[in-house]
Amino acid sequence: MESVRTLWLSVALALAVGSRVVRGHPQPCRVPTRAGASVRLAALLPRAPAARARVLAALATPAPRLPHNLSLELVAVASPTRDPASLARGLCQVLAPPGVVASIAFPEARPELRLLQFLAAATETPVVSVLRREVRTALGAPTPFHLQLDWASPLETILDVLVSLVRAHAWEDIALVLCRVRDPGSLVTLWTNHASQAPKFVLDLSRLDSRNDSLRAGLALLGALEGGGTPVPAAVLLGCSTARAHEVLEAAPPGPQWLLGTPLPAEALPTTGLPPGVLALGETEQHSLEAVVHDMVELVAQALSSMALVHPERALLPAVVNCDDLKTGGSEATGRTLARFLGNTSFQGRTGAVWVTGSSQVHVSRHFKVWSLRRDPLGAPAWATVGSWQDGQLDFQPGAAALRVPSPSGTQARPKLRVVTLVEHPFVFTRESDEDGQCPAGQLCLDPGTNDSARLDALFAALVNGSVPRTLRRCCYGYCIDLLERLAEDLAFDFELYIVGDGKYGALRDGRWTGLVGDLLAGRAHMAVTSFSINSARSQVVDFTSPFFSTSLGIMVRTRDTASPIGAFMWPLHWSMWVGVFAALHLTALFLTLYEWRSPYGLTPRGRNRGTVFSYSSALNLCYAILFGRTVSSKTPKCPTGRFLMNLWAIFCLLVLSSYTANLAAVMVGDKTFEELSGIHDPKLHHPSQGFRFGTVWESSAEAYIKASFPEMHAHMRRHSAPTTPHGVAMLTSDPPKLNAFIMDKSLLDYEVSIDADCKLLTVGKPFAIEGYGIGLPQNSPLTSNLSEFISRYKSSGFIDLLHDKWYKMVPCGKRVFAVTETLQMGVYHFSGLFVLLCLGLGSALLTSLGEHVFYRLVLPRIRRGNKLQYWLHTSQKIHRALNTGPPEGQQERAEQERSGPKDELPATDGAGRWRRVRRAVERERRVRFLLEPGEAGGDRPWLCSNGPGLQAELRELELRIEAARERLRSALLRRGELRALLGDGTRLRPLRLLHAAPAES
């Protein structure tokens, strides 16, 4: 048999090595690859139908995968009877199929537990038993093949909690008071082992009856002595039901401090008839059977995974267990190896941390609360949470009556509180943590996104070893975080911070409180620090400190920019100013023309006598160019008076244009309007019109106030409310806006207004519903008075004012200094009037063009035919040239024909004896009538149009005079060129056509 097995293993190893070489399989070379290979975990189901159904449901979940392509198969077996023989046969049937490596059992009696331990040791197959507390019994020496897990809190864990309380109070001598314990001697021994000290008294009350004086007489040993002292400082009550514990505490004499050793739920703890200061403990949440079964399957899977990595051949080749032949080497090797790995396995499961001690005792995470019977503010007895115990660590709340556990150095350990908060600017901000998951500034806080207590406990436990994902780590800072840090420093406590899972302040929904209030009531947090409004509904279920911030409710609206009208671009100046500007422009142009034509140095024929003249149209062009700041080719006046007037007009235009542009931006944006609301009693809120929407934050103090005071208003606004304040502000500022008004705490609204970059938000109306922000704590918390006292000190010392200045000292929106790069953005609708004006200008240009053609084709020929209005040089040089030079364009063709025909002859006289006009002889000569000098114009010789003889002589005389004028002009032009060359003038000389044409004509 052994040789066959060895040969088979050799073949398998060879195949594995070949597979690794050929395919690069990542498995070790000695591990055979068998597709679909599986190992089996058997489950011996409980007899109760309800428990059996729950176990089957837990086993139906997919089993975890194992290394080396292994799978874990779950096999469930139910035994019809629970006698020892049937149970033994059932377990042997469970272990008979091949591949079964371990089993899970649910013993319901002590004989079953003993039988399971015997069979596990005999078959060397690990068995994990899930026990109830009453099934526990002494089984002799523990065996590594039988692991036990207590579903409920085991007695050892309860004793650990009690011993931690005794040591925290520094009680050296205590008394054990037992109500109904099966083996008092074993219990006392167990206490002595845990406390390292035997109790001073042990009172067994199982035979004493409360209906007579026997119970009171038995407890008299614990009463105060004659000297005023007590025999023991504390007494621990164990094994008592709620009713029996009430009877014992009512009959107990005054003196010792009582501890209820049996965990009880909070609602089962009595409050009347008990001595003050009684300490009780209770498990916060008992683990479900499904979670326990899941973790036990995970325990076996974790051990199998570890074994498969170290000894893959034992995990892959488990042998069949035969109860008739228990000497099988393969089974012995696999079972012992798996038992050794089970004893060293620990992981984080659904029940929390899971670990094994002593190779046979399985532990899961336990969490207990410690309560103390106190007096509430009205004097009534009430239970208050004073501490908590988890996985061997006892933590007291600050201000609790219990003493702290002394540290080795003699200093007192700082307790740790769990604080819940809610992000609300500026009281609490959040940002991402750094690459290492730490916060250089602010406090590290978790954002779990859930309100599950087990999940929170697991996350904070993982935070200690740094295994929390970075996505859940946040850095919290703000007004309330600074206040919390100061309180922690003055009250000497540490804290761990997390953000509320549902993001709500808290309201009563379907009989349960949500948000911050729900976390305080469920014991998930010791205090709530944020902008937590104090109101009557919340004060009935949780406690608040004195307010550290006073505020009220307010209404925030958004300003709207009205559209600018078409003529908005003219609004910077009054209509009278526009009329005055254009009237001054035309009047200035007129005076410029008059000064230029009356000056001996003006650009006119009488003045400088050049080819161009300064007319009224030139003056208008110049004045418009100066007014609108455009650079065009325009004629400028040459006389000093005209230039002075031109500069004066430029100064006038500069001042007017500067004033216009300074007011243009504000006018073009348009007016800012907003919803005018006088307050919460405004008719717009109580009788909203169609389309008017307003809301608040869900489950906030503002919603609670409106719901209680104005139910109809709340019915209208609840469908428009937002989950948080930033969401509500975003709905108000969206485009188009989803809200017309937003109601919330005025302190939060004022901050949103101060940081609004667009200056679109403002608060309106009178404040209402004066309230304050306080720190929330569970009812009857001993921290309330201490925190309130320190908050009052902070107000008196000015620390609260410093916090307000730090987080609220913002630049008001109306006085904000804009950056240089920040510009006013205006759309097309702002300049709609200018576009309309441009379109009108295009239409007017068409009319002007039509008028130009009418003047050129109809008016101009009529003026040419007449003798009046021939001199237009002072008004328009173009019109003057058109009247006194060549023919109109319509006569161009006829002029060309006449130029190609016979030479022009002198006109003859008509029959009336008068000379006809000789315009035809010079109609192609483009000339300008310059004013001649008086001496030259004073001759008495007749002109062309004159009557009389001597025409040939006069013509020759004129030609001589023209030649002389040309010579003088040539000399002048040459001299001007020389002067310009000397002065550095780069202007090129005009072509001297007259100078070049003279020799040709001669």
From Swiss-Prot:
Residues 25-574, 662-832 are extracellular. Expressed in the hippocampus, the corpus callosum, in the facial and trigeminal nuclei of the brainstem and the ventral horn of the spinal cord. It is a multi-pass membrane protein. It is found in: Cell membrane; Postsynaptic cell membrane. Glycine binds at residues 531, 533, 538, 701, 745. Residues 951-984 are annotated as: Involved in the trafficking and surface expression of NMDARs. Residues 595-615, 628-641, 849-1002 are cytoplasmic. GO terms for molecular function: glutamate receptor activity; glycine binding; ligand-gated monoatomic ion channel activity involved in regulation of presynaptic membrane potential; monoatomic cation channel activity; neurotransmitter receptor activity; transmitter-gated monoatomic ion channel activity; transmitter-gated monoatomic ion channel activity involved in regulation of postsynaptic membrane potential. The chain crosses the membrane at residues 575-594, 642-661, 833-848. It holds the Pfam family Lig_chan. D-serine binds at residues 533, 538, 701-702, 745. It catalyses: Ca(2+)(in) = Ca(2+)(out); Na(+)(in) = Na(+)(out). Glycans are attached at residues 69, 212, 344, 451, 465, 786. Keywords: Calcium, Cell membrane, Coiled coil, Disulfide bond, Glycoprotein, Ion channel, Ion transport, Ligand-gated ion channel, Magnesium, Membrane, Postsynaptic cell membrane, Receptor, Signal, Synapse, Transmembrane, Transmembrane helix, Transport. Disulfide bonds join 439-475, 445-476. It comes from the Eukaryota. One of its GO terms (cellular component) is presynaptic membrane. Residues 616-627 dip into the membrane without crossing it. Residues 891-906 have a biased composition (Basic and acidic residues). Residues 882-910 are annotated as: Disordered. Residues 1-24 form the signal peptide. Residues 944-985 form a coiled coil. Forms heterotetrameric channels that contain at least two GluN1 subunits and at least a combination of one GluN2 and one GluN3 subunits (in vitro). Forms heterotetrameric channels composed of two GluN1/zeta subunits (GRIN1), and two identical GluN3 subunits (GRIN3A or GRIN3B) (in vitro). Does not form functional homomeric channels. Belongs to the glutamate-gated ion channel (TC 1.A.10.1) family. NR3B/GRIN3B subfamily. This is Glutamate receptor ionotropic, NMDA 3B. It comes from Rattus norvegicus.
